Structure formats: C-alpha cells, structure tokens
Curated annotation (Swiss-Prot):
GO cellular component, one term: mitochondrial inner membrane
Membrane side Mitochondrial matrix: residue ranges: 12-115
Chief location category: mitochondrion
The keyword Manganese is assigned to this record: no
Annotated transmembrane regions: 116-136, 557-577
Name the record gives this protein: Mitochondrial distribution and morphology protein 32
Positions in the Mitochondrial intermembrane compartment: 137-556
Length: 577
C-alpha cells in the first residue's frame, strides 16, 4: 500500500500549481495522515511507526510548506509587471482563473462558448447596433454606392413582386439608434402589377428604421420602428377578381407587425380602379404606437395623431376631448379603451367619388362633411379575456350634406354585393325633396344678394353743401320692446320660410361591429361598414322627408283653420251689426 501512496503523491506534486493544485496536495497529505492515524489507532505496529517517521513523509510536508511560502498575491504580480500588456494579462487571468498559470483546454473551450453565446445575444437584443456596425465597416472599406446596390439586390432576391433601390448611402445614426436611408425607391415589379390587387411606385426622401431579430424569430417581421419623411408617389388599388380577395393577400406575411410608425410631409396619389377615381392624400403628421397588418384599421384609429388632407380637404384622427377626466374619474369611458374622433372638412361630392358609387349614384353635386366618433374596446381578440368583455366597435356618425344636386339615374342605388338598396318609386321623393330645398335656398340667397333690395340713393343739391350726398339704406328696426319679433318672422305663415340660409341636410347613424369582422382588412369597402352606413343614412333621410311633409301639411291645416275661423268671426260680427 505504501508504494502506491508514494507514487500518487509524487504525481500530485508535479501537477501542483499556485491555487487549486496546492489544495489537492494538502488534501492528499491529510488523507495520508488520516490513513496513518487510523492504522496507528488500530494497531501500534513497528511498521506503521516507521512510516510516520520516514523521510518521504517529511519531504512532502517540506514541499507543501515551500508552496505556501511562495504563494504570490495579485498586487505583487502587478508590481512585478513591466508593461501594459503584462498588467492586462495578469488582470485578465486573475479575473477568469484567479491565478497566473496558463489556460487549460477546458477553460479555453468555456471562454469560446461564452464568446459565441454573447455574440448571439448581442445580435438578438441589439440588432440595429449590430447591423449599423456592419454598415459602418462596409462604408469604410467599400464605396457607399456599392454597399447600397448590394443591399438592394440582396433584398430583391427575398422579396417577390417588390423592387427596392437605394440611390444614396446608408448611414447609421448612433445617437438615435437607427439606420437611415436617403432617396429610397420602392415599387412593384411588372409581373406583380399585372396579377396583384395593389401596385405602387413610391419615393422616400428619408427612411429610418430599427431592426429586431427577436421579433423576426417570432414570425412578426424584422423591421421594428419606421420613420418616414418626404414620401411621394402613386398607389393603385385594383378591382378584385374574387369576392373573398382582400388587400392583405398581397403581403407574404400577414402576421407582420411594426412598432412605432411616424410619417410626415408626404403626398400620395391613390387611384381606385373600380370606380376610376383619383384621390390626393397628403399626410402632414402621423404617429402610431403600433401597426399590425391583421388589425390595421383598429391601429389606425388608435393612433396618437393623424392629420392631413384629402383632395385639399383637411382631415384628422385624434383622441376625443371630453370633460370627464376633469373630475378625476378613472373609469370614465368604461367599457371603452378610447374614443377617437375622425373629422373630414367639407369636400366636394365629386372629389370624394360619391357620384360614382353604387349607393349614392343619384347625387351629382354638392359637398359633404363628416364627423365620426369611434368607441374602441379595452381588449383585443388575441388577448385572453372573459366572455362578458366588450368586443364591439361602435361608430357614431354625423354626416352633413350641403347644396346637393340630385337627378334620376338609370340604375337604382345598390349595395356592394349588387343588391338593390331602394327602388325608383322610393327614390323619387328623395330627389324632389333635395331639389325643392335647393331651389328654395338659392332663391333666398339671390334675394339677399340682390342690389335692388339694398339700393344706394344719391340726391343732387344746389346749396353749398357737397355735390353728392349719399344716404345709405338702413335696415328696418322694430320699436323698443318688440325686438323679439324678427323681421322675417310671419304672424301667419303662408309658405315655408327656413330660419337660416344654409342648405344643409344632417344625417346621423350608429353602427356596431364585432372586432373579428375588422380583422385582416385594410379598406372600409372590404367590410360591410359602408353598406350598413348607406342603409342607416337612407333610413334617416326618409324619416326627415316624412317629418318635413307632415310639418308642411300641419302648417297648411293651421292656416286653413285660422282663415276659416277668422271668416266666421267677421261674418258673425257683421251679422250682429
């Protein structure tokens, strides 16, 4: 047993170092001493006593003592270093292995594993910084134009139907943590123009974005935040060959999601090929916290602010202002998450394409103004929610038509599916009501603007006064105390006399839609919201016409009754006299 222990101790001494191996030697020596002590306790033989007093045991103890005395601290190693490289080497080794010995194979493999893992984490968590560093190195080594062409060609290989061209350098912005592109052109290829529902040719003055590999691994796209400035171009939406075809089918990944989206100073010419109408859409400022392709309409209504112009008519989407938060009511809009207001200033009916639509093809001229309050629920369908949670979007619309011009069309109004909305017999009273109202208000305006009703009288005098004296025509005023009686107010009303000169027809309606019905839609015409709005507007318009006819009939009955009663009174008084 003793030769085995001796050989083991020798090998341990040769493998010993400054730290860990010294502890191994001390443990071996302690084990040797405990073994000897146990053997001595078992039996006090002369052989065991001789082993304790042997020179080999004393030699091992001497070596351990020398190693403990020669142990050097970090400060002593640094004091003996001669240069920066030596100090860096000592600090690095002391941080990693707490010593100054060479690295072992296991330690080197561990360092390489941690290095690779850290690079993977850097790419996942800091994708924009990683790509910015690559672009910076590429711009430093190669020409900037070559880098832009290479990136554009690489993107075109993986994007079907879309052509991307970088006409200027790609510069990383370190302060903002973005990658900026100058003069970027994005357009559809000729093959996609022939077969797709959507074709576009857009030019971006400045395009900044951030990337996220983590989002890309989740299947939600590589681009995270997008900032667009100076976008202009043409966008055309074609007619769908299939009834179930939607605009989202153009995109290869319908689950694509963007983070923060900002667009400013942009102009787009949109063409609706189905009705042959062009719209000039100007976007002054748009800020959205998120944009998901599957919920694009809801995210648009949830935008922080959207302001722009449609054919030079201003529109805006913003959070509606109300007085309830002034009273510090936490759940003042429950069960709604937010109430957004969509406002469109007066716009010509022809600019809006209303005369070319199937539902309002009898309108030839005039203007329309719209105010819509959209009540959005607190939760989205993909989140876990109880069954009693509100999942409906309520749209409260107020549409004002002004100076409408109506005429009978050869085709009756119809819905988007071709179903007849109203018949010609039901349409005739509407056209008569609109045209009679327009004729009445136009005559009143001509009467007010007629110079004969406000003449300027001039009198020539022979005295030393000025040659011409101007006497303005003054408006007649009732005596004091009778100011409540208006000039145009009649005691007995013989005809319809409106209270103002604005030929406005105000229609109101409310539409409720389940959130799932707005999923995977980019346009309102892809949903049946437009058809429901047309039905509600026609119902309100017919109700207005019936109320007007009833009021007119009631006024004539009052007039005839008053006239007949006055004649009887005069006849009775005459008979008495």
């Amino acid at each position: 047993m003793l030769p085995v222990l001796r050989s083991g101790l020798r090998r341990a001494v040769w493998r010993c170092g400054h730290g860990l191996l010294q502890r191994r030697i001390a443990a071996g020596a302690g084990w040797y001493a405990r073994a000897c002590a146990s053997d001595d306790a078992a039996s006090r033989s002369p052989l065991k006593q001789e082993m304790l007093n042997s020179t080999e045991y004393l030699h091992v103890q001497n070596i351990l003592l020398q190693k403990n005395q020669q142990r050097m601290t970090k400060q002593k190693l640094l004091s003996e270093a001669t240069g920066f490289y030596d100090r860096f080497k000592i600090n690095t080794k002391w941080l990693l292995i707490r010593g100054n010995r060479p690295f072992s194979g296991e330690e080197i493999s561990t360092l390489l594993s941690w290095l690779i893992l850290s690079q993977v984490l850097w790419v996942i968590l800091g994708t924009t910084t990683f790509v910015s560093l690559l672009l910076f190195l590429a711009n430093t080594v190669l020409a900037k134009e070559m880098v832009g062409k290479f990136v554009g060609n690489s993107l075109n290989r993986y994007m079907d139907g879309v052509d991307v061209q970088f006409q200027d350098a790609m510069v990383p912005e370190w302060r903002k943590g973005q990658i900026s592109f100058q003069k970027v052109r994005l357009r559809t290829t000729p093959g996609a123009q022939d077969a797709g529902l959507l074709t576009f040719d857009l030019m971006f003055s400045k395009l900044s974005l951030t990337l996220s590999v983590r989002k890309w691994l989740q299947g939600r796209g590589l681009i995270n935040d997008v900032y667009v400035s100076g976008m202009k171009g043409d966008v055309s939406v074609g007619a769908a060959e299939r009834k179930d075809a939607k605009l989202i089918d153009f995109f290869s990944n319908p689950n694509y999601e963007l983070g923060e989206v900002e667009v400013c100073d942009s102009v787009i010419m949109c063409t609706d090929q189905e009705i042959g109408q062009k719209f000039r859409v100007s976007i002054y400022n748009m800020r959205m916290s998120q944009l998901r392709f599957r919920w694009s309409l809801l995210d648009l209504f949830n935008a922080d602010v959207v302001s722009g112009a449609l054919n030079h008519s201003l529109f805006s989407i913003h959070k509606r202002q109300h007085k309830l938060p002034l009273h510090e009511m936490e759940k003042d809009m429950a069960p709604w998450k937010r109430i957004s207001r969509l406002r469109l200033n007066p716009i010509s009916v022809k600019d809006l394409g209303l005369d070319k639509s199937n539902a309002f093809n009898w309108i030839e001229g005039g203007s329309v103004e719209m105010i819509a309050d959209l009540m959005l629920p607190n939760i989205y369908p993909e989140s876990a929610a109880a069954e009693d949670e509100n999942k409906y979007v309520v749209m409260d619309l107020r549409i004002t038509f002004k100076d409408l011009i109506a005429s009978m069309n050869t085709v009756p109004p119809a819905l988007s599916n071709g179903r007849e909305l109203i018949s010609f017999d039901e349409l005739k009273p509407i056209i008569m009501f609109v045209n009679n109202r327009r004729g009445l208000f136009s005559s009143l305006r001509n009467l007010d603007n007629n110079k004969l009703w406000r003449p300027t009288v001039t009198i020539e005098r022979q005295q030393s006064y000025p040659d011409t004296t101007v006497i303005p025509m003054r408006t007649f005023q009732w005596p004091e105390g009778e100011g409540s009686v208006q000039l145009n107010q009649e005691i007995i009303k013989y005809h319809e006399n409106p209270s103002d000169n604005s030929n406005e027809i105000i229609l109101r309606c409310r539409i409720a839609k389940h959130m799932n019905e707005l999923q995977n839609t980019f346009l309102f015409k892809e949903t049946d919201v437009y058809d429901k709005m047309a039905l509600e507007l026609y119902t309100d318009l017919m109700k207005m016409i019936e109320e007007t006819e009833y009021k007119k009939k009631n006024d004539w009955v009052k007039l005839l009754g008053t006239t007949f009663a006055s004649q009887l009174l005069i006849f009775g008084l005459g008979a008495m006299v």
